[in-house]
């Protein structure tokens, strides 16, 4: 695999990808470079060939990628990687795929994976919609996790939120029947939108009933996003959906 960043970290991000939804386009995250620490830069230089997946826009055989058949869990927007690392440490029988656009977060997790010798984890530094549409086969995933996505809390920016109908339908296609979607947010308004979208998406059933949430499952640790939200007086909503 090639290093997605040269030693100067100068790769220009591609144009954001979109999913058409009527007359409106739903955008995934925009690649964000951020600042590298020397350790994070070394992570890309030294760890990416082992744990990274270079996006090429072609369907991928995930069992071949990991060298085994196992349940496949995708986390979209893993941030600093704490939740993914926790899951990989506590259930190594599963294979984990992470997508994150913030390069320093990717670098941090690369170093952690090397420390853990976690060869059952692979990372993308790319647009989530492009990865799902072009590299993940329909029915290839057992679970999709989306923890604390950007709430775009200003009303005029709500349309930029990730959980839109077109994106939910894309996730349904990639989950096998019997698979699971787990979302978490500390913004009540975003939880309301998630219910609006996901409860109405064919192929998804809310495990807690319409407009319901569940207690934080033991496979999701309390993240720094969650802690920050609680300090601001926000609640936290975990939404769990089964793929029919």
Swiss-Prot record:
Binding-site residues for S-adenosyl-L-methionine, renumbered to this chain: 75, 100, 127, 150
Reactions catalysed: guanosine(46) in tRNA + S-adenosyl-L-methionine = N(7)-methylguanosine(46) in tRNA + S-adenosyl-L-homocysteine
Record keyword S-adenosyl-L-methionine present: yes
Any single Gene Ontology cellular-component annotation: tRNA methyltransferase complex
EC number(s) stated in the UniProt entry for this protein: 2.1.1.33
Chain spans, region Interaction with RNA: 156-161
InterPro entries given in the database record: SAM-dependent_MTases_sf, tRNA_(Gua-N-7)_MeTrfase_Trmb, tRNA_methyltr_TrmB_bact
Pfam families noted in UniProt: Methyltransf_4 (PF02390)
Keyword Translocase included in the entry's annotation: no
Gene3D superfamilies assigned to the protein according to its UniProt record, in alphabetical order: Vaccinia Virus protein VP39 (3.40.50.150)
Active site residues of this protein: 150
Residues reported in the UniProt entry to bind substrate: 154, 186, 223-226
Molecular-function GO terms, alphabetical: tRNA (guanine(46)-N7)-methyltransferase activity
UniProt keyword annotations, A-Z: Methyltransferase, S-adenosyl-L-methionine, Transferase, tRNA processing
Disulfide bonds: none
Domain of life according to the entry: Bacteria
Disordered, as annotated region: 1-22
Record HAMAP family: tRNA_methyltr_TrmB (MF_01057)
Family that this chain belongs to: Belongs to the class I-like SAM-binding methyltransferase superfamily. TrmB family.
Role: Catalyzes the formation of N(7)-methylguanine at position 46 (m7G46) in tRNA.
Matches recorded under PANTHER family: 3-DEOXY-D-MANNO-OCTULOSONIC-ACID TRANSFERASE/TRNA GUANINE-N 7 - -METHYLTRANSFERASE, PENTACOTRIPEPTIDE-REPEAT REGION OF PRORP DOMAIN-CONTAINING PROTEIN
Protein name, as recorded: tRNA (guanine-N(7)-)-methyltransferase
